[in-house]
Swiss-Prot record:
It is found in: Cytoplasm. It comes from Brucella abortus (strain 2308). This is Glucokinase. Its main location: cytoplasm. Signal peptide: none annotated. It catalyses: D-glucose + ATP = D-glucose 6-phosphate + ADP + H(+).
Length: 343
């Protein structure tokens, strides 16, 4: 008789690692602990009804390699045997994956837990720094990622290992501070009466902010998508779009600074996700760093804390791969998040 159990031990190769976001899913396979990852094309989650179907058709059917272990990073909290994804209709069912796809071992982490693992695994040329001093080697770090949603995680060092701290920080309250903020915020869409970080600092948040600016200025919106708004803001062809990017950078700087204070992140704040890379020039323009540092009475501390934009699209896979290769380098709790077939 076969039974599925939790297990705390190293991973059996080959290992399939996957980063499952609200819009895109990325996968690679590690044949062994020393091999370079075998990468696969980025998938659109909307193109497949289930994650099992996506893995079968886009991964397993395209290679002769049969993974024994799987490590997935998913957008949303990991709780129970059926894991719903935030901003995506997929449901991860590890027991079903083991039964149907031939895996022996499935581990599911939070997507920004994987991003946290990545910040101490990426090479320097995969990041671009915005202000601050060089990071302190073993100091606490924070990862903040506006994309389809808004992800947040911390990373701290014990005596022997790095410990990622996942959470749902994208759903904290965010509020007005300046006179202009007070003009715009009444027009921002609320969730049960709240304006959350994700309602502004995400793809849809970018559009919410643009519509709020247009409403405050009594101007009919002419741009439909976050991509349109970003393009028009970067080239300066639309004043409201340009202000959208400036305020997006401002609010992102405020939140990043708050998180840096909470964690006292002398190891740096790391911006991941698709949006920071696309608007890098806007983040460098000044308002982001200025509001990041504007944290009296601790402005001197904030001036020293570096911010780095992760420019590598496969950062989460890098973090998961590092965990698969050298799990002893990290302290990752897999209780209730790892399923294994015992034969």
């Amino acid at each position: 008789m076969q039974a599925i159990i939790d297990a705390e031990q190293s991973f059996k190769f080959p290992v399939l690692v996957g980063d499952i976001g609200g819009t895109n899913a990325r996968f690679s396979i590690l044949v062994d602990s020393n091999a370079e990852p075998k990468e696969f094309p980025v998938l659109q989650t909307a193109d497949y009804a289930t994650i099992d179907e996506a893995i079968q058709h886009a991964i397993l059917d395209q290679t002769a390699i049969q993974p024994r272990s799987v490590i997935l990073a998913v957008a949303g909290p990991v709780d129970g045997d059926e894991i719903d994804l935030t901003n995506c209709d997929w449901v991860v069912r590890p027991k079903k994956m083991i039964a149907d796809l031939g895996f022996e071992d499935v581990t599911v982490l939070n997507d920004f837990e994987a991003q946290a693992l990545a910040v101490v695994s990426l090479e320097g040329h995969h990041m671009e720094q915005i202000g601050g001093k060089p990071e302190e080697a073993v100091a606490t770090r924070v990862v903040l990622g506006p994309g389809t949603g808004l992800g947040v995680a911390g990373l701290f060092r014990t005596r022997h290992a790095w410990v990622p701290v996942p959470g749902e920080g994208g759903h904290i309250d965010i509020g007005p501070r300046t006179e202009r903020d007070y003009q715009i915020f009444p027009h921002i869409e609320r969730i049960e009466g709240r304006v959350t970080g994700e309602q502004i600092l995400s793809g849809r948040g970018l559009r919410n902010l643009y519509l709020g600016i247009c409403a405050a200025d009594k101007i009919t919106p002419t741009l439909e998508t976050p991509v349109d708004i970003t393009s028009a803001g970067l080239d300066g062809s639309n004043p409201q779009a340009a202000e959208t990017l400036d305020l997006f950078a401002t609010y992102l700087g405020r939140l990043a600074g708050d998180l840096a204070l909470i964690f006292m992140a002398h190891g740096g704040v790391y911006l991941s996700g698709g949006i920071p890379v696309r608007i890098l020039s806007a983040l460098k323009a000044g308002s982001f760093r200025a509001t990041f540092e504007d944290k009296a009475p601790h402005k001197a501390i904030m001036r020293d804390i570096p911010v780095r934009v992760i420019t590598y699209q496969l950062a989460a896979l890098t973090g998961l791969s590092a965990f698969a290769r050298t799990p002893s380098r990290f302290e990752v709790s897999t209780e209730g998040r790892r399923w294994r077939m015992r034969r």
